């Protein structure tokens, strides 16, 4: 099955390379408001059930009249003016994991250990409210169906919570690897969270993000996850992004631990996680046995995992967000999507920051994933970008069904042939 790229060049319309273009036929240039239009595509996802291929939607004026297989729609609406809508017709995709406050960074593809000091640390002065607002503006312009944003600075949370043009979850990020500081750090985080809960409005809601299993002490991790579970706050945790994270939990050392800033960490990993590393210990197993998976956090990346890890995630009912372009650019490995899908784990797509993911456009993430997983049914990718994302960020998936309003944002056209 192939997506095909079709572009539009009528009425002087320009094409934004950051978005998917639309496609029309000459018959569509001057449509009668009461003449049905049959829009066809390679993959149709109506927001219900699974996606189908091929697909089509009949639109009359600005209202959806029917959706289904093109042959059946041609039979039901023989006088409909047919046009190709593009590769995909579906509700807008969700960017389920990103860092909007890094939107002023330049994209750089570098090995993970080079990227952190040369990009993240060197460019830290670029982070802040202005960058986050610019990133949020980009998502709005792209017509994103929702966002899962990791927020580090309180002033960024204040600014983003006030926006009414986005939906999804803003996850307040907390990190501190010293167990003796856990109560103090938790108390400060709780003070912020309780104030922000009073500022929530329809659209963006509040969440919590303990950074990683090795930058948050075992005590703080448990305090945060228990609090989130009790308060109904969604969680996101970065887990198993780089191969050396797995090595670190097995041996207590390796490049990831050795390249840390010593003044910011205890002397040993055992002090951080409250147990000795071991050959069978993984970040996922650690979180599970600590009781954190019981809070059903969304786990981000999950590239370097074992079959037992996948089984634990499935049993706990945790969702996973994969960021294919970022993982590729930082040489982290490839997320085992088929294995997670076989285990019944809900998968969503995110871009990570523009510094590693290049853009905030999830449609481009779908394009890249289609190349990365040639054996994976593209219907799975589309559903993950929509339904999987909405389930992660707590949104409602729009439906393409009879009587619903048609939106041009339902047209997805890939930027290149695959």
From Swiss-Prot:
Pfam families linked to this entry: Amidohydro_1 (PF01979), HUTI_composite_bact (PF22039)
InterPro entries according to UniProt: Amidohydro-rel, Metal-dep_hydrolase_composite, Metal_Hydrolase, MQNX/HUTI_composite_N, MTA/SAH_deaminase
Catalytic reaction annotation: 6-amino-6-deoxyfutalosine + H2O + H(+) = futalosine + NH4(+)
Enzyme Commission number(s) from the entry: 3.5.4.40
Residues bound to Zn(2+): 97, 99, 238, 352
Cofactor binding description: Binds 1 zinc ion per subunit.
Pathway given in the UniProt record: Quinol/quinone metabolism; menaquinone biosynthesis
Catalytic machinery residues: 241 (proton donor)
Recorded GO MF terms: hydrolase activity, acting on carbon-nitrogen (but not peptide) bonds; metal ion binding
Source taxon at top rank: Bacteria
Swiss-Prot/TrEMBL cofactor(s): Zn(2+)
GO process terms (BP): menaquinone biosynthetic process
Protein keywords: Hydrolase, Menaquinone biosynthesis, Metal-binding, Zinc
Binding positions (substrate): 173, 211
Keyword Nuclease among UniProt keywords: no
Family according to the record: Belongs to the metallo-dependent hydrolases superfamily.
Function: Catalyzes the deamination of aminodeoxyfutalosine (AFL) into futalosine (FL). To a lesser extent, can also deaminate 5'-deoxyadenosine, 5'-methylthioadenosine, 2'-deoxyadenosine, adenosine, 1-(6-amino-9H-purin-9-yl)-1-deoxy-N-ethyl-beta-D-ribofuranuronamide (NECA), and S-adenosylhomocysteine.
PANTHER family the UniProt entry points to: AMIDOHYDROLASE-RELATED DOMAIN-CONTAINING PROTEIN, AMINOHYDROLASE SSNA-RELATED
Protein name per its UniProtKB record: Aminodeoxyfutalosine deaminase
Species in which this protein is naturally found: Deinococcus radiodurans (strain ATCC 13939 / DSM 20539 / JCM 16871 / CCUG 27074 / LMG 4051 / NBRC 15346 / NCIMB 9279 / VKM B-1422 / R1)
Biological classification of the source: Bacteria, Thermotogati, Deinococcota, Deinococci, Deinococcales
